[in-house]
């Protein structure tokens, strides 16, 4: 790694500290995983999105967003090589950038959507490294994180591992609870309707049976007296 590259890396780290931005680095051709945490209660019922900021003051162009039905936010949504999934109970939205290319480098945002408004959860600066075989240089990338001058910056390095995880268990439990609750309510309604249809006929049958029994008993009691 040349001195110019190291200087640029230090400059980017200092800039990210000033902008409260997380720096993530990944190798070209491999995958990079981004996790944005948020307040689960504050952002309850809101969709999440991953967008790319165009320029320093430009708009943020949306890349991918979570499922339109909030209860299904744990399902993975894909747009090209970018995948997003949201664990709404844990308060973590995960974005996976597959097959990183040099053009994927840039400034991104994790957003919480509320109608037409978008609240920034986290800013992420993605760096794509061109030489995945140079382990010596890759190890040197951790120097800015250990430096006391840039203590507040967050720099991470990603390798090509199968980082796709299964569906978040908390969201699955929530979905199963809703399904079971809906089935219970449906069964209760059917039982109430069936019982309501039986009620009108029941007293009539019982009344006729009681009347016949009473008449039969009356004939038996008055029979000996009349003869």
UniProtKB/Swiss-Prot annotation:
In this UniProt entry, which residues are annotated as the site Cleavage of ectodomain?
157-158
Q: Which of this chain's residues are annotated to bind a 1,2-diacyl-sn-glycero-3-phospho-L-serine?
A: 67, 88
The record's Gene Ontology biological-process terms are:
amyloid-beta clearance; amyloid-beta clearance by cellular catabolic process; apoptotic cell clearance; astrocyte activation; cellular response to amyloid-beta; cellular response to lipoteichoic acid; cellular response to oxidised low-density lipoprotein particle stimulus; cellular response to peptidoglycan
Q: What induces it?
A: Expression is increased during oxygen-glucose deprivation, reaching the highest expression level 12 hours after reoxygenation. Expression is also increased by ischemia, where maximum expression is reached 7 days after ischemic conditions.
Question: So which residues are the signal peptide here?
Answer: 1-18
Record topology, Extracellular segments: 19-171
> Which ranges of the sequence are coiled-coil?
none
Post-translational modifications: Undergoes ectodomain shedding through proteolytic cleavage by ADAM10 and ADAM17 to produce a transmembrane segment, the TREM2 C-terminal fragment (TREM2-CTF), which is subsequently cleaved by gamma-secretase.
**What range(s) does the Ig-like V-type domain occupy?**
29-112
Q: Does the keyword Membrane apply?
A: yes
GO MF annotation, one = kinase activator activity
State the tissue distribution: Expressed in the brain, specifically in microglia (at protein level). Expressed in macrophages (at protein level). Expressed at higher levels in the CNS, heart and lung than in lymph nodes or in other non-lymphoid tissues such as kidney, liver and testis. In the CNS not all microglia express TREM2. Brain regions with an incomplete blood-brain barrier had the lowest percentages of TREM2 expressing microglia, whereas the lateral entorhinal and cingulate cortex had the highest percentages.
Q: What is this protein called?
A: Triggering receptor expressed on myeloid cells 2
Q: Which organism is it from?
A: Mus musculus (Mouse)
């Amino acid at each position: 790694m040349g001195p110019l590259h190291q200087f640029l890396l230090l400059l980017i780290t200092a800039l990210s500290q000033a902008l409260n931005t997380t720096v993530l680095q990944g190798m070209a051709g491999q995958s990079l995983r981004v996790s944005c945490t948020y307040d689960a209660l504050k952002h309850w019922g809101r969709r999440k999105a991953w967008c790319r900021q165009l320029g320093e003051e430009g708009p943020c162009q949306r890349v991918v967003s979570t499922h339109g039905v909030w209860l299904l936010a744990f399902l993975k949504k894909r747009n090209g090589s970018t995948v997003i999934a949201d664990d709404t109970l844990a308060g973590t939205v995960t974005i996976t950038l597959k097959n990183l290319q040099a053009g994927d480098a840039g400034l991104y945002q994790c957003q919480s959507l509320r109608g037409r408004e978008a609240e920034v959860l986290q800013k992420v600066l993605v760096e794509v490294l061109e030489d995945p075989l140079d382990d010596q240089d890759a190890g040197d990338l951790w120097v800015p994180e250990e430096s006391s001058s840039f203590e507040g910056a967050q720099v991470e390095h990603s390798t090509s591992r199968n980082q796709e995880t299964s569906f978040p268990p908390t969201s699955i439990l929530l979905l199963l609870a809703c399904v079971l609750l809906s089935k219970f309510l449906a069964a209760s309604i059917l039982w109430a309707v069936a019982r309501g249809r039986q009620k009108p006929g029941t007293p009539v049958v019982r009344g006729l049976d009681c009347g016949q029994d009473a008449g039969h008993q009356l004939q038996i009691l008055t029979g000996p007296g009349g003869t």
